């Protein structure tokens, strides 16, 4: 019997030396490698967390997708992973292809099999990560946490978790979210990282010529 996808997942930071959080990678593997080298990332002692959207648009989507199988990487699901899973499950590919999924069609048959296997594993990606580190309690979701009060295992609209930009669009109100120290999101490409109270937006458009943002949580 197929297990339901987890919504929430917890990470205990004391298991790791350093914890790094990456903005949307979108197939930009070389940018990620350079950033990890610069921060002296150690895959045996450190953890890399992705805010989702490791695939599509960039040059190395398959390699980035396969990163999720490494013991030193974890991620929340992004809307692009969800589009890919939905496309393969339904065989309705048009939405995914219009949004950067054409790399999959260009793969050789054996590579498509590898991609399908990796995307099947994405069914186990949580929508929301709660990370307990030496710098506090961090909540990570791809686009938004669609409530003004965070609670572990609270029912929230998962479509908004993957797609919503409304909170960022209302940033002039300056309202944060209670229930954790920091909230981290990607999804909306920005020229630079945006911090509004305890809300942090770190998709800085690596695939569009911007820098890939890497944040040290511990």
UniProtKB/Swiss-Prot annotation:
- UniProt cross-references to InterPro entries, sorted A to Z: Ap4A_hydrolase (IPR050126), Calcineurin-like_PHP_ApaH (IPR004843), Metallo-depent_PP-like (IPR029052), Ser/Thr-sp_prot-phosphatase (IPR006186)
Residues given in the record as Mn(2+) 2 binding sites:
53, 79, 187
Domain of life of the source: Bacteria
Name under which the protein is recorded: Serine/threonine-protein phosphatase 1
One GO molecular function term of this record is: protein tyrosine/serine/threonine phosphatase activity
PANTHER family xrefs: METALLOPHOSPHOESTERASE, SERINE_THREONINE-PROTEIN PHOSPHATASE 1
- Name the consequence of residue 26 to L: Loss of function
Instruction: Supply the alphabetized keyword list.
Output: Hydrolase, Manganese, Metal-binding, Protein phosphatase
Q: Which reaction does it catalyse?
A: O-phospho-L-seryl-[protein] + H2O = L-seryl-[protein] + phosphate; O-phospho-L-threonyl-[protein] + H2O = L-threonyl-[protein] + phosphate
Q: Where does Mn(2+) 1 bind?
A: 24, 26, 53
PROSITE patterns found in the cross-reference section: SER_THR_PHOSPHATASE (PS00125)
- Enzyme Commission number(s): 3.1.3.16
- Organism, per UniProt? Escherichia coli (strain K12)
Cofactor(s) needed: Mn(2+)
* Pfam families documented for this protein: Metallophos
Query: What is the annotated role of this protein in its UniProt record?
Result: Plays a key role in signaling protein misfolding via the CpxR/CPXA transducing system. It also modulates the phosphorylated status of many phosphoproteins in E.coli, some of which acting as major chaperones. Has been shown, in vitro, to act on Ser, Thr and Tyr-phosphorylated substrates.
Per UniProt, the enzyme's principal EC class comes to hydrolase
């Amino acid at each position: 019997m197929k297990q339901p996808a987890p919504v929430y997942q917890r990470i205990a930071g004391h298991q790791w030396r350093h914890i790094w959080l990456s903005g949307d990678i979108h197939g930009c593997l070389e940018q990620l490698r350079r950033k990890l080298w610069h921060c002296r990332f150690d895959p045996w002692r450190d953890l890399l967390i992705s805010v989702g959207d490791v695939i599509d648009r960039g040059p190395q989507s398959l390699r980035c997708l396969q990163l999720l199988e490494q013991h030193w990487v974890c991620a929340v699901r992004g809307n692009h992973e969800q589009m890919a899973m939905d496309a393969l499950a339904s065989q309705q590919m048009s939405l995914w292809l219009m949004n950067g999924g054409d790399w999959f069609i260009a793969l050789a048959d054996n590579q498509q099999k590898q991609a399908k296997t990796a995307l099947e594993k994405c069914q186990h990606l949580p929508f929301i990560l709660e990370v307990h580190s030496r710098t506090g309690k961090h909540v990570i979701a791809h686009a938004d946490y669609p409530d003004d009060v965070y609670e572990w295992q609270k029912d929230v609209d998962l479509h908004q978790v993957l797609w919503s930009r409304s909170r960022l669009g209302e940033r002039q109100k300056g309202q944060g979210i209670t229930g954790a120290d920091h909230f981290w999101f990607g999804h909306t490409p920005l020229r630079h990282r945006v911090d509004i109270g305890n809300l942090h937006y770190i998709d800085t458009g690596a695939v569009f010529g911007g820098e890939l943002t890497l944040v040290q949580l511990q």
